[in-house]
Amino acid sequence: MQSTLSQSPGSRFSQYMALTKPRVTQLAVFCAVIGMFLATPGMVPWHVLIGGTIGIWLLAGAAFAINCLVEQKIDAMMRRTAWRPSARGEITTPQILLFSAVLGSVGAWTLYTFTNPLTMWLTIATFVGYAVVYTLLLKPMTPQNIVIGGASGAMPPALGWAAVTGAVPGDAWILVLIIFVWTPPHFWVLALYRRKDYENAGLPMLPVTHGEKFTRLHILLYTVILFAVTLMPFISGMSGVVYLASAVLLGAVFLAYAWKIYRDYSDELARKAFRYSIVYLSLLFAALLVDHYARPLLGV
């Protein structure tokens, strides 16, 4: 009975969807869409909004599918990822490669057709940065994998901005910098309470190579830097007081988590901090959007 169910169309679709890491993709695409809206004082043209969103989503999914393929043996050794269809051998290597190729090709065509060549090439470069540079080279070789590899994961706002304007100005790079600095503490709190998983899989995550205390200190330091970086949209004039108030409040909570982790660590606290870090980034970018359209009305 179970074998029959696993081959049903709905189940097969779910297996392929799992390869795209939907929750991670959703956050990345959300940040890209915010970048689109911040790039213009008015509304984003519908063909750009829809085409850009779909294209970025497809190429992100293609990159995550390659990641699942490369790490299928590693995923099988980790409780957090052992459920993935690639780790369980439910989808073959040729099937994953074909799936990724189709997603990537359709995504690139969509971006070229509905946005512009710059967006397509930047998104392809992001694909290569994540699927090849991070997954194949950085992650298995250095504890700084998240710091260096975070550059590709930080690109969505720039992709969205480029989709609308055909350029990536300084304000877009500020948004990229926010995600770039957010990435290490976000993943390091996960690595703290999943340390055994990473150790068993042979991955040189910071808690494995440098220990818990060193990692806790770096989480705190990066969170302090993140707090400062999130003030840059206000300082640059891109955003107003609505965003500033949101950034300070959200950042204060994140700092409180980082301080508690540094002073009195527990796995449960790290889990809460990890979940909050996702909420934090989502609300921070939502605040950018609200401020963008509320600012002219409020005159602040």
UniProtKB/Swiss-Prot annotation:
Record's catalysed reaction(s): heme b + (2E,6E)-farnesyl diphosphate + H2O = Fe(II)-heme o + diphosphate
UniProt xrefs under InterPro entries: Protohaem_IX_farnesylTrfase (IPR006369), UbiA_prenyltransferase (IPR000537), UbiA_prenylTrfase_CS (IPR030470), UbiA_sf (IPR044878)
Residue ranges of the TM segments: 24-44, 46-66, 94-114, 118-138, 146-166, 172-192, 224-244, 278-298
Major location (coarse): membrane
Pathway: Porphyrin-containing compound metabolism; heme O biosynthesis; heme O from protoheme: step 1/1
Enzyme Commission code(s) on record: 2.5.1.141
Annotated Pfam families: UbiA (PF01040)
Key words, A-Z: Cell inner membrane, Cell membrane, Heme biosynthesis, Membrane, Transferase, Transmembrane, Transmembrane helix
Protein's cellular compartments: Cell inner membrane
Membrane topology: Multi-pass membrane protein
Record GO terms (molecular function): protoheme IX farnesyltransferase activity
GO biological process: heme O biosynthetic process
Keyword Kinase listed: no
GO cellular component, one term: plasma membrane
Note: Carbon 2 of the heme B porphyrin ring is defined according to the Fischer nomenclature.
PANTHER family: 4-HYDROXYBENZOATE SOLANESYLTRANSFERASE, PROTOHEME IX FARNESYLTRANSFERASE, MITOCHONDRIAL
HAMAP family reported for this sequence: CyoE_CtaB
Similarity remark: Belongs to the UbiA prenyltransferase family. Protoheme IX farnesyltransferase subfamily.
Role description: Converts heme B (protoheme IX) to heme O by substitution of the vinyl group on carbon 2 of heme B porphyrin ring with a hydroxyethyl farnesyl side group.
Protein name according to UniProt: Protoheme IX farnesyltransferase
Taxonomic source organism: Burkholderia ambifaria (strain ATCC BAA-244 / DSM 16087 / CCUG 44356 / LMG 19182 / AMMD) (Burkholderia cepacia (strain AMMD))
Gene that encodes the chain: ctaB
